[in-house]
């Protein structure tokens, strides 16, 4: 077995596209995904799972139907399952997402922002 640290900076250097999560590791049935984003996402929910957002660089706002939370680099937030939300960022943000394998980024919604799942880098 090879033991090697995963470097976020190096992983972000491998892609430029936004709103396309890339898997960098797995733990049990959970995937760790890096993603770049800027602008508004779509309103969506994940009915069967929570979703964790960890901001590595930039500022992210997650809108909810009854409020919002703003996250800066070094902060995280767990969106509870079944809660409709919409991530957005004025400037590019780099995130680490933690969610179960197979979770689609747009939940059950279909849009131009729906990304391929299980894309590894």
Language-model features: where?
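A short, N-terminal "cap"/entry segment at the start of jelly-roll beta-barrel domains
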Residues: 1-33, 110-120
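Conserved short histidine dyad/triad with adjacent acidic residue
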Residues: 17-18, 31-47
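Short secondary-structure boundary/capping segments within folded domains
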Residues: 23-28, 43-46, 54
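A cytosolic small-molecule/anion-sensing beta-strand core signal
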Residues: 28, 56-57, 72-73, 91
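Short, conserved beta-strand element in jelly-roll/cupin
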Residues: 36-37, 46-63, 98
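Short acidic-glycine-tyrosine-enriched beta hairpin
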Residues: 65-81
């Amino acid at each position: 077995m090879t033991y090697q640290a995963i470097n976020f900076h190096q992983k972000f250097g491998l892609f430029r596209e936004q709103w396309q999560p890339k898997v960098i590791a797995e733990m049990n049935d959970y995937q760790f995904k890096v993603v770049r984003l800027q602008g508004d996402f779509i309103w969506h929910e994940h009915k069967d799972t929570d979703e964790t957002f960890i901001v590595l660089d930039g500022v992210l706002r997650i809108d909810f139907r009854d409020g919002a939370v703003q996250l800066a680099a070094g902060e995280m937030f767990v969106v509870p399952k079944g809660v409709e939300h919409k991530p957005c960022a004025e400037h590019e943000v780099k995130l680490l997402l933690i969610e179960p394998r197979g979770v689609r980024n747009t939940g059950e919604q279909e849009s131009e922002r729906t990304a391929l799942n299980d894309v590894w880098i």
